[in-house]
Amino acid sequence: MTPSISWSLLLLAGLCCLVPSFLAEDVQETDTSQKDQSPASHEIATNLGDFALRLYRELVHQSNTSNIFFSPVSIATAFAMLSLGSKGDTHTQILEGLQFNLTQTSEADIHKSFQHLLQTLNRPDSELQLSTGNGLFVNNDLKLVEKFLEEAKNHYQAEVFSVNFAESEEAKKVINDFVEKGTQGKIVEAVKKLDQDTVFALANYILFKGKWKQPFDPENTEEAEFHVDESTTVKVPMMTLSGMLDVHHCSMLSSWVLLMDYAGNTTAVFLLPDDGKMQHLEQTLNKELISQFLLNRRRSDAQIHIPRLSISGNYNLKTLMSPLGITRIFNNGADLSGITEENAPLKLSKAVHKAVLTIDETGTEAAAATVLQVATYSMPPIVRFDHPFLFIIFEEHTQSPIFVGKVVDPTHK
């Protein structure tokens, strides 16, 4: 290979899926009452909260009439790992685009934060299945910088595969097999086509299989109307749950807020805006409010109705990350000289993010959570998620947002 050739890098960031799961009966309980208060955890949660909301708002800006589903953890992990081999403006843009203040946080602490987060997500003794994986696919005649390789393995638990990108079908199969296996077959054909000058690919996936602590009874699921907009209504299977639930109305957001726990240490926050208040919710929601919802748990007698659904997201990260200031890595001025020892310039030719979500009735009986139980209404409220709503799924120990979504039409997969 000669220095005049420009090589391409393919980034498959955040190939993720979230599906319901039945847990084994003999699974051991873990103590989830203690939040992880280490500086690394606090740092990553703060930045990921900002990053998740900026990314969400950019997706809304690009299309306000579509379902949204993505994993901020996966996207941030992939770009942070890539930053290990970047230099100059390319390096600065990546980390600042991920909402890190480089005057307050050292690069070493950033990577330690991601290392700690990935270790937390991949804990084998959790009551739910939550796992991540990073794969580096390197052309068989390309020599990587040893420091990049070491740090990618150490901080990001990366696996390295030697492939022949000249045989594009064979290389594509190796990458797709890695993702398909990691997501247990939920995401196939992550790569449909490889650019002919690709010599290096990075793939990141996240798999989450969880069960509700308070399950929905399938016998109570009935067909109901969901109002996509003022003129469009669709029929959906609507799940129903009654009892002591963590649901309240937030006047600041003009929205109902519902918190539902998965077995283990993961919580889903659902946000249902009042009529005509979706834009207000999207503009007002911030990480401080979300943190308060997670910390100040309260239950009251209520009934909720929420659609059973399967949605997915498929995004071109070049158009998504550019408004966040991450641009240099995608053009010929990219400095990724810390990745390979070769002289030819390397740029990120393509970056894609694919995500799949399924929400249904399955769950486990709840062990009583330690919460403040209050009754706000004289009559139990009935909250119907029968028009567009948002949701965020958090890992509770680190309070990191692992999934973010918006349901506009539950019938669109």
Swiss-Prot record:
GO terms for biological process: response to cytokine; response to peptide hormone. GO terms for molecular function: serine-type endopeptidase inhibitor activity. It comes from the Eukaryota. Residues 1-24 form the signal peptide. GO terms for cellular component: extracellular region; extracellular space. The keyword Glycoprotein applies. SUPFAM superfamilies: Serpins. The record marks Y377, S378 as: Reactive bond. It is found in: Secreted. Residues 368-387 are annotated as: RCL. The keyword Metal-binding does not apply. Glycans are attached at N64, N101, N265. Keywords: Glycoprotein, Protease inhibitor, Secreted, Serine protease inhibitor, Signal. InterPro entries: Serpin_CS, Serpin_dom, Serpin_fam, Serpin_sf, Serpin_sf_1, Serpin_sf_2. Its main location: secreted. PROSITE patterns: SERPIN. Inhibitor of serine proteases. Can inhibit trypsin and chymotrypsin; relatively ineffective against elastase. Murine alpha-1-antitrypsin is represented by a cluster of up to 6 individual Serpina1-related genes. The precise complement of Serpina1-related genes present varies according to the strain of the animal. This is Alpha-1-antitrypsin 1-4. It comes from Mus musculus (Mouse).
